[in-house]
Amino acid sequence: MANLNKRPDWIKVKAPNSTEYYNTKDLIKNLRLNTVCEEAACPNIGECWSKKHTTVMILGSVCTRACRFCNVKTGRPDLLDPYEPQRLAEAVQKLNLKHVVITSVDRDDLEDGGASHFAECISEIRKSSPNTTIEILTPDFLRKEGAAEIIANAKPDVFNHNVETVPSLYKTIRPGARYYNSLSLLHNIKKLSPEIFTKSGMMVGLGEEINEVVQVIDDLREAKVDFLTIGQYLQPTKNHAEVAKYVTPEEFKYLERLAKTKGFLMVSASPLTRSSYHADEDFQKLKENYQQKLVS
């Protein structure tokens, strides 16, 4: 039986130590911004920050949910910071980002789940960095009427919301969420603003069956999702859900090939694939694939 306490060689990454990494770290600290890279203990932080790529986390650093896979703090959330959109726009400008990814904690305590704060962040970035493309990775806005409309009207270039896992594992892995609500949110954004690219992702290695993964792939395509990401679940701490399996690179290649036959504009599936990993390069490919589809 495989030792799941020891990560296989294909999971290992180099420790961050580049000058660019520390410059990015200092700028984020000085502007008092949170990043999901740090809060969620992302394995790709060294590579991304060395390239000045970062995923900023808005709406505070404390989440109102307690998902079993996530390393972000849970509890009573922070007060909303009205100056955060301006600081975020300043960071985007100083880092000279061509593409920025904005995510957030869940804010079930807010009337719109934080949708209007996302919209304000988009607006501020557009003012100071009009050529920067904007990708947002949002919570599910469960029971937040009108949130999807606020997001769609803000016109991000990419709307990302992750289904995270298969429906049968929601009760144990993502207890505060509803699978079909997530699908509905993705579909609604596409219906409200067809020009917005939609994106969703899931983790594998939590105990799901292959037929369940295939069903999620089909469900996401039916919801008109353009871009699918699939990555290996890694246990952040001993208090989180255990890894049930380390999916091999060959198995990821199979899932990627399968998903590509379903009609997605883009699919990324590998052990270290994460929602925001290589997001800037992937956005360019996404646009190219869309243009090719139009002329084919």
From Swiss-Prot:
Binds 2 [4Fe-4S] clusters per subunit. One cluster is coordinated with 3 cysteines and an exchangeable S-adenosyl-L-methionine. Its cofactor is [4Fe-4S] cluster. [4Fe-4S] cluster 2 binds at residues 63, 67, 70. Residues 49-265 form the Radical SAM core domain. It is found in: Cytoplasm. GO terms for molecular function: 4 iron, 4 sulfur cluster binding; lipoate synthase activity; metal ion binding. Its EC number is 2.8.1.8. It comes from the Bacteria. InterPro entries: Aldolase_TIM, Elp3/MiaA/NifB-like_rSAM, LIAS_N, Lipoyl_synth, rSAM. One of its GO terms (cellular component) is cytoplasm. Pathway: Protein modification; protein lipoylation via endogenous pathway; protein N(6)-(lipoyl)lysine from octanoyl-[acyl-carrier-protein]: step 2/2. The keyword Methyltransferase does not apply. Keywords: 4Fe-4S, Cytoplasm, Iron, Iron-sulfur, Metal-binding, S-adenosyl-L-methionine, Transferase. It catalyses: [[Fe-S] cluster scaffold protein carrying a second [4Fe-4S](2+) cluster] + N(6)-octanoyl-L-lysyl-[protein] + 2 oxidized [2Fe-2S]-[ferredoxin] + 2 S-adenosyl-L-methionine + 4 H(+) = [[Fe-S] cluster scaffold protein] + N(6)-[(R)-dihydrolipoyl]-L-lysyl-[protein] + 4 Fe(3+) + 2 hydrogen sulfide + 2 5'-deoxyadenosine + 2 L-methionine + 2 reduced [2Fe-2S]-[ferredoxin]. Its main location: cytoplasm. [4Fe-4S] cluster 1 binds at residues 37, 42, 48, 276. It is an enzyme of class 2 (transferase). Belongs to the radical SAM superfamily. Lipoyl synthase family. PANTHER family: LIPOYL SYNTHASE (PTHR10949), LIPOYL SYNTHASE, MITOCHONDRIAL (PTHR10949:SF0). This is Lipoyl synthase. It comes from Rickettsia rickettsii (strain Sheila Smith). The gene is lipA.
